[in-house]
Swiss-Prot record:
Domain notes: Consists of 3 domains; the N-terminus binds the ribosome, the middle domain has PPIase activity, while the C-terminus has intrinsic chaperone activity on its own.
Principal localisation: cytoplasm
Protein name: Trigger factor
Example of a GO cellular component annotation carried by this entry: cytoplasm
InterPro entries the UniProt entry points to: PPIase_dom_sf (IPR046357), PPIase_FKBP_dom (IPR001179), Trig_fac (IPR005215), Trigger_fac_C (IPR008880), Trigger_fac_C_sf (IPR037041), Trigger_fac_ribosome-bd_bac (IPR008881), Trigger_fac_ribosome-bd_sf (IPR036611), Trigger_fact/SurA_dom_sf (IPR027304)
Organism annotation: Vibrio cholerae serotype O1 (strain ATCC 39315 / El Tor Inaba N16961)
PROSITE patterns, per database record: FKBP_PPIASE (PS50059)
Length: 433
């Protein structure tokens, strides 16, 4: 076998491979003998059919199969010999082919980029310094009370925090439009569900009032025919309701499965959950900054084959969100996933290089700690831990998580790390903050 390597544009490579004719003919002859020996032919005892007859019947198909197998096998031998690391499947193209002739073919493919990590010392990581305070726990308990609240009709004006039931009809230039009409529509005031100005027009109104408001649809509204349009809404208020919060007592506590200890036990459980969420949020914020810095400091070429693979993964995930509708997900445009796919490939390649250069292997103690920490969110943590330990696939998945965390730790060890005091709510709700 003769091999030459061509460097094409970017990460593209082309191998020119020549396979001696004897290799091809020997493989074809061997396969034809196998057919003659094992298949039945009318008028002949098994294994006694003339080879010329077998060659006439199957020669062309066998040669095609042999050529495909030979190209694949010699491609693998060639990349091993040349120490090349393909990033995707090759495209084969015969250059010279024919009975009794050497097989000359090309294999075109992409290779992984050569990554040389740099600039880790320039990465800035701001570590959040936060804790769960009594006030945070009290606020969370208030949120739980709101989630369990009931609504009671009141003889009061509509305002933020109250709920109204309304009939409305929307029109543009005197003409009603699709989706602009509803009856007994429940609207929680201040929730921001409607277009700007809609809720403002209802504030101060009471049961039975009928009125018209003027609003303008946002330029980025989802319905193309309504973007930026001025509209009128005729509205009737059917009722106004106020939220009634349940008392923080044993009956309320029982709704959350806390059998003993009353309110204090619920507070302790809430604090424990909040502290677990806080720990995860701090870890995620640090990881996000470390990876962002790594990507910024290390621009690399990305094999399109890997991007294509990642797009397929994202499409499959989209199909799961669509209830398993693979066909619907397949129709989604490539552009919808391309940026995210490229980002994931870049991060994967860079973290892989961090792991390689630091000779990292999954720390089994860290793996156990991650499983134990994750299991605390379940009713029976020991059962969850046991389930993981008995499932090799789940254990390998957790080893990958641990290895990625170790890679992030290696980045942070060389980065510029500072601490910043931040509240629990600011960390958990950065947009609202």
């Amino acid at each position: 076998m003769q091999v030459t390597v061509e460097t094409l544009e970017g990460l593209q490579r082309r191998l020119n491979i020549t396979v001696p004719a004897a290799n091809i003919e020997d493989a074809v002859a061997a396969e034809l003998r196998n057919i003659a020996k094992n298949r039945r032919f009318d008028g002949f005892r098994k294994g006694k059919v003339p080879m010329k007859m077998v060659a006439k019947m199957y020669g062309k198909a066998v040669r095609q199969d042999v050529l495909g197998e030979v190209m694949q096998r010699h491609f693998i031998e060639a990349i091993v010999k040349e120490k090349i690391n393909p990033a995707g499947a090759p495209t084969f193209a015969p250059v010279e082919i024919g009975e009794g002739k050497d097989l000359v073919f090309t294999a075109t493919f992409e290779v992984y980029p050569e990554v040389e990590l740099k600039g880790l010392e320039n990465i800035a990581v701001e570590k959040p310094a936060a804790e769960v305070t009594d006030a945070d726990v009290a606020e969370m308990l208030e949120t739980l009370r709101k989630q369990q609240a009931t609504w009671k009709e009141v003889d009061e004006a509509a305002e933020n925090g109250k709920r109204v039931s309304i009939d409305f009809v929307g029109s543009i230039d005197g003409v009603e439009f699709e989706g602009g009409k509803a009856e007994n529509f429940p609207l929680e005031m201040g929730a921001g569900r409607m277009i700007p100005g809609f809720e403002d027009g209802i504030v101060g109104k009471t049961k039975g009032m009928e009125f018209v408001i003027d609003v303008t649809f946002p330029e980025d509204y989802h319905a193309e025919n309504l973007k930026g349009k001025a509209a009128k809404f005729a509205i009737k208020v059917n009722k106004v309701e106020a939220r009634e919060l349940p008392e923080l007592n044993d009956e309320f506590v029982a709704r959350f499965g806390v059998a003993e200890g009353g309110v204090d036990a619920l507070k302790a459980e809430v604090r424990k959950n909040m502290e677990r969420e806080l720990k995860q949020a701090i870890k995620a914020r640090i990881k996000e900054q470390a990876i962002e810095g790594l990507v910024k400091e290390n621009e690399i070429q990305v094999p399109s084959a890997l991007i294509d693979q990642e797009i397929n993964v994202l499409r499959q995930q989209a199909a799961q969100r669509f209830g398993g509708n693979v066909e619907a997900a397949a129709q989604l445009p490539r552009e919808l996933f391309e940026e995210q796919a490229k980002r994931r490939v870049v991060v994967g390649l860079l973290l892989g290089e961090v792991i390689r250069t630091h000779e990292l292997k999954a720390d089994e103690e860290k793996v156990k700690a991650l499983i134990t920490e994750m299991a605390t969110a379940y009713e029976d943590p020991s059962e969850v831990v046991s389930y993981y330990e008995q499932n090799q696939q789940l254990m390998n998945n957790m080893r990958n998580v641990a290895l990625e965390e170790q890679a992030v730790d290696a980045i942070i060890a060389k980065a510029k790390v500072t601490e910043k005091a931040i509240s629990f709510s600011e960390l958990m709700n950065p947009v609202a903050a």
